[in-house]
Amino acid sequence: MSAVSQPQAAPSPLEKSPSTAILCNTCGNVCKGEVLRVQDKYFHIKCFVCKACGCDLAEGGFFVRQGEYICTLDYQRLYGTRCFSCDQFIEGEVVSALGKTYHPDCFVCAVCRLPFPPGDRVTFNGKECMCQKCSLPVSVGSSAHLSQGLRSCGGCGTEIKNGQALVALDKHWHLGCFKCKSCGKLLNAEYISKDGLPYCEADYHAKFGIRCDSCEKYITGRVLEAGEKHYHPSCALCVRCGQMFAEGEEMYLQGSSIWHPACRQAARTEDRNKETRTSSESIISVPASSTSGSPSRVIYAKLGGEILDYRDLAALPKSKAIYDIDRPDMISYSPYISHSAGDRQSYGEGDQDDRSYKQCRTSSPSSTGSVSLGRYTPTSRSPQHYSRPGSESGRSTPSLSVLSDSKPPPSTYQQAPRHFHVPDTGVKDNIYRKPPIYRQHAARRSDGEDGSLDQDNRKKSSWLMLKGDADTRTNSPDLDTQSLSHSSGTDRDPLQRMAGDSFHSRFPYSKSDPLPGHGKNGLDQRNANLAPCGADPDASWGMREYKIYPYDSLIVTNRIRVKLPKDVDRTRLERHLSPEEFQEVFGMSIEEFDRLALWKRNDLKKKALLF
């Protein structure tokens, strides 16, 4: 590689025939007149320029890299080597030590600031390089021990002769002997020692490292312990106030959450206050009975198309947002008033999807045997009739009133309504617009009841009625036998029955025949479902049927609303897993999972992304 500083005159052979002409290596044209020669190549003066900046290279130095000609400034900028000490580019002789490069004059002892003589021993103590004279006072101990330490390598055990040496772990090492004990990687920068042996950072963490339970990264330096959990000091944050924990400060650990003691106490106080009041934005109160003798109130909330009771709401985590909560002042309630046949028969059929709605009602005592129809508007569809048992005597038999074309008596308030009926409320009074699914307890029938009912009438019936005394109901003069027949041309399927023919005496529901004109309502009872009402959702594992979905379609990956199948229970996504997939995800059977505490189940569900 050479640079031609002065243009050379073209010799006479350049003006020979084209077959012997000399071509420019850059432009490919014939060289005439003054040309430059670089090694065995020829260039026009104007064609010999820097590949990077285009400056003229005829008068200055240049470098050749992969057949390209580059000026000095651009070559140093692109490919040059800097001195570790002065940060200037190195040209000419280079000194390399511990993976770093220096000018010969810049590689000096850190103590006496003198350059190292050629062939002299260099000692590196982990931070600085020292000459042989300055490194002697560093070691502590007898001169014999010092001499032995200087002569033998801590890695190979052989004598360290003239040359560079490295001081680490109170030993001297050949530069090529200071390696990771596990992978054998040469350690020329940071390392971590364990039992007097050096390890690279990756192998040390793989063998002895501790992971942070919050960020799941390895912890180096200070570590905060809470029980069996470990955290970076910056990762251990109170779930309530979001502040870090000071050194020596007490911590309250619950599941995977950590609290300041004061924050935990404040949260408990808030939880107790929340149990005694209902939020107008998140829950609605549905009366168990509208009579003055109603013994209880049942609290529901509408979440993502599902109706949740108070147990389900209490199981929801505080960090999970609740969507689609219907305001209680938007739900229409009407007094229990008897209405004409036209009001009871005018129902419109709209586009509705199947959504379950838990309904529980308690019986109300009454001293009269008369029955009147009332109105209750949770939906605009599926007008189910509920009848309640009699009063103290237990012999008052509720029955379906006979509907006729004659004008009914004036509307009056009744103290003990026993039939619940959906009136013609239209779209404006109904914000749910979903067909309810009525559920009932499956248990024993009371001893005093007669269980004989005609099997054919059971299959035809599509209305739920509180079962009274069978003989009294059959002989009741208020029951019109003509109204028990099915209208011709009406296609209805019977309600699905729970396993077993007996029901709990507290909820002695039975079936009665439909009212006249039932086929005109456009109602479809085929989706009616009988399931336990008000029972513990966990206890109803074997009673309620959960549709099986693959694990991938049930995963909740973040805190925003996730698109899940419509018919899944968002509070119990794990119930929609098959037993085999449940065992694979949680490492236990369903029965073992149900026996765990609630906080433990929620913690496992969070780790499985099903919470």
From Swiss-Prot:
Subcellular localization: Cytoplasm
Residues that coordinate or bind Zn(2+) 2: C109, C112, C131, C134
Tissues expressing the protein: Highly expressed in skeletal muscle.
GO BP term, pick one: cytoskeleton organization
Disordered: region residues: 269-295, 336-527
Residues with Phosphoserine modification: S282, S294, S364, S367, S452, S476, S578
Bias-annotated ranges (Low complexity): 279-295, 363-372
Biased composition regions of type Polar residues, renumbered to the chain: 393-404, 473-488
Gene Ontology CC entries for this record: actin cytoskeleton; cytoplasm
A Pfam family: LIM
Protein role: May act as scaffold protein. May stimulate ABRA activity and ABRA-dependent SRF transcriptional activity.
Protein name: Actin-binding LIM protein 2
Species for this entry: Homo sapiens
